[in-house]
Curated annotation (Swiss-Prot):
CDD domains found in the cross-reference section: bHLH-O_hairy_like
Name of the featured protein: Protein hairy
Record key words, sorted: Developmental protein, DNA-binding, Nucleus, Pair-rule protein, Repressor, Transcription, Transcription regulation
Every Orange domain range: 114-143
Keyword check for Nuclease: no
Gene: hry
Biased composition (Low complexity): 182-207, 301-328
Any single Gene Ontology cellular-component annotation: nucleus
One of the protein's GO biological processes: periodic partitioning by pair rule gene
Amino acid sequence: MVTGITTTMSPNVLGTAVVSTQQQQQQQQHKEAPIKSDRRSNKPIMEKRRRARINNCLNELKTLILDATKKDPARHSKLEKADILEKTVKHLQELQRQQAAMQQAADPKIINKFKAGFADCANEVSRFPGLDSTQRRRLLQHLSNCINGVKTELHHQQRQQALAQAQSLHAQVVLPSPPSSPEQEPSVTPVAASGNNNSSSNNTNTTAPYLFGQIQQNANGYFLPNGMQVIPTKLPNGSIALVLPQSLPQQQQQQLLQQHQHHQQQQQLAAAAAAAAAAAAAVAQQHQQSPLLVAMPQRTASTGSASSHSSAGYESAPSSSSSRGSYAPPSPANSAYEPMDVKPSVIQRVPHMHLEQQPLSLVIKKQIKVEEEQPWRPW
C-alpha cells in the first residue's frame, strides 16, 4: 500500500508513484553495495595487521622472559606461543609473591610480632635445666645479637623508604651519599642539576673522605662539617645522592667546587708520588737480582793455545831475570870451559801480559785469523 494515494486518483498518477518508490529503493541498494564491498576488501588487511601485532608482542615477551630468567637466547630461539605465554604468567606470579613477601617483611606489625615471639623463645631457652652458666650466658648473648641485627635491618629499611620519598625534590648540585658500610669508600662529586645524567654518573668516582667523615643527620636532611645542608635524593639510575637545596647561595656553591678541585689535585699528586716510588723500588730490585759480569780478554787462534800453557810460568818468573844481560859462568880456575856469552832468551824478554780492560759482556766473539797455506820448498 502506497501512502498518500486516494481512491479518487487516476491510474496514471498511481503508476508514477509506484515507479518512484522502486527507483529510490534501487538507489539505496546501490549505495550500500560499495560500503559492503569495501569492508570485505579491508578485512584481510586488518586481519594481517592484527596478526603482526600479536607476533611482535610475543617476540618482545620472549626476549623479556629469557632476560629475566637468565637463560641463553640461542638455546631457546624457537619457542611456541603457548610456551611464551606460560613462562610470562609464571614470572608475573613469582614477582607478585616476592612483592607480597617484601611488604610483609617491611610491615612494622609483623616485625613486632616476630620480635615478641623471638623474645619468648629466648626466655624459654634460658629456662632449660642442666645448662652451664657460661654456656647459657653465651647462648643468650648470641640470641640478643640476632634480635639486635633484626632491629638494625628494620632501621635501614625505614631509612631507605625515607630516602625514596625525597625523589620529587629539585636540585642544583648533586653529591653522592655516604657509604652504608666501612668497606665502601665515600665519594663526593658536585655536579650541576641542569646538566645531563651522563656527566653526573661519570663524576661519581672522586673520593673525598674529608667531607663525609663528620656528617650529621637531622630531620631536614644532612649537615656537612662546614654547615651546608644536603637532602637525600634518588637518581634516575637508582643510586642515592645528597642534593643541595635550590636556596643555596652561589658563593657557597663556588666554595664547594673549589674545595673539591683542590682535594682532587692533592690526590693526583699523591698518586704520582706513589707511582714514582714504586718504579724506583722496582729498578733497585732489578739491579740487585742481575748477575755479575766478568771481563774476558780477546784471543786469537794462533796464540791461544801457546799462551794458555806458558802464561802462568812466565808471569811467576821474577822481574830481575829479564833485566840481566848475560849469564855468569863458573870461574876458569875451577873449570876447563871457556866463558861464553849467553844472550837472554826470547822467552825471557817477553813482557808480562797485561790484560786490557774490556767491556763487560756475557758473550764474547773470538776473532779467528785464517793463515794462508805456503807451498813447501826444499831449499
